[in-house]
Design a protein with these regions (language model features):
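Short, glycine-anchored, charge-dense loop/turn motifs used at functional sites
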Residues: 1, 144, 165-173
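Short N-terminal helix-loop-first-beta-strand/juxtamembrane motif that initiates sensory/input modules
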Residues: 55-59, 153-167
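Solvent-exposed, polar/charged alpha-helical surfaces in well-ordered, non-transmembrane soluble domains
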Residues: 6-14, 21, 47, 51, ...
Length: 367
């Protein structure tokens, strides 16, 4: 039915944008009676094309996912492809719930593709997908994204991440990592912007891991907060030296001061002071599930890494005590700190709160 593919292609390109030669190739196909020229076109632009009354060009009503909050929470939500299938984020995690079942229409057609009067036809109505309610607080999410971006700029950092989680329930109220992504405009998305890195990437935590060592020591009962320990300015093992981040002389610290001063030397010696100290630290890291996946309902969760105990030298134990030579995801660390705030009960971080249509409220494991 297309009478002048070149002219029609140029007319379409003038309205929809893109390369006229691409449209011309589509309009010139001889091996098919149907081809999409543009899917999910803007409604106003489609109306302009319709006014052109082009031969052989027809219009099909379609649906597409809209993201009214744009970038805010975009990484968490994820995005769909042109067929409405979840590709990343919660769109992928809960695709089977959200997508429903597409309808079908089958009919006998003649040589020119026209329906045969009285021919066999079958129609199956579409079934809508379900809604889900998630834990994200959109105002807190926006605030968090702004703060992470500002902090990264102030520190000239290559990236940044942050998590806000309810320690008692595991509901994630806000979570963000640079660079951000707007699911309504994936053409401008940067590499890895579709990943929520506090979930998908492990990192070497550094001094925030000292709380893990301190909790181990307190649970083993080898030191109290006010016990004193001599802490040289530098300690050495296996040909390596360990010192604090700030220069100081030899000093004696209470265990409380070791944490307050964030002393690498102090926490190293405190761990080593336990009977089989490095073994105890290793066992407690395992006990706290710090290198294990949290079970969060988000695709692509990473595990942490910890060398097998048989490979530990003295310097390994020291390094691990202050968060080097070990890797965890930010969410794994948040879960650990959450357990400290939750009387030792560890929860499962999650986004899904309920399924309104069915009234289902999921339950999550605690330990």
């Amino acid at each position: 039915e297309v009478t002048d593919a070149a002219a029609e292609a140029q007319a379409i390109a003038n309205v929809l944008g893109g390369d006229a030669s691409t449209y011309r190739e589509l309009l010139s196909k001889e091996s098919t009676t149907f081809v999409y020229v543009k899917r999910q076109a803007d409604v106003d632009a489609a109306a302009e094309v319709k006014k052109l009354a082009l031969d052989g060009v027809y219009f099909i009503a379609d649906t597409r996912r809209e993201y009214p909050c744009g970038q805010i929470g975009g990484q968490v939500i994820g995005y769909c492809n042109v067929d409405g299938e979840g590709i990343t984020g919660l769109e992928l995690q809960y695709n089977d719930i959200l997508s429903g079942t597409p309808g079908t229409y089958t009919a006998e057609r003649g040589e020119k593709g026209l329906p045969i009067p009285g021919g066999v036809k079958e129609e199956t109505p579409a079934v809508d997908g379900q809604d889900i309610m998630i834990s994200i607080d959109i105002e807190l999410q926006e605030y968090l994204e702004n703060r992470v971006a500002e902090a990264a700029e102030d520190m000239t950092a290559a990236g940044g991440s942050s998590v806000v989680m309810d320690a008692g329930t595991g509901e994630i109220y806000a979570i963000a990592s640079l660079p951000y992504m707007d699911p309504s405009d994936m053409t401008s998305a940067k590499s890895s912007s579709d990943q929520v890195k506090p979930i998908t990437q492990a990192f070497e935590p550094g001094s925030v891991f000292k709380t893990v060592s301190a909790t181990t020591i307190l649970e083993e009962g080898t030191m109290t907060p006010d016990d004193m320990l001599f802490c040289p300015a530098v300690i050495e093992a296996d040909g390596y030296k360990v010192s604090d981040a700030h220069e100081r002389s030899d000093q004696t610290f209470s265990f409380r001061q070791i944490l307050d001063q964030s002393s690498n030397v102090g926490i190293s010696l405190s761990v080593q002071k336990m009977t089989d100290g490095f073994t105890k630290l290793y066992e407690h890291i395992q006990k706290y599930n710090l290198c294990e996946k949290t079970g969060v309902d988000y695709p692509g969760e990473a595990s942490g890494t910890l060398q097998p105990l048989e490979n530990w030298a003295t310097i390994t134990g020291w390094n691990v005590s202050f968060g080097q030579g070990v890797a965890v995801t930010p969410l794994q660390l948040v879960r650990f700190y959450g357990a400290l705030a939750n009387d030792g009960v560890e929860v499962t971080p999650h986004f899904l709160v309920s399924k309104p249509q069915t009234g289902e409220v999921p339950t999550y494991d605690t330990e």
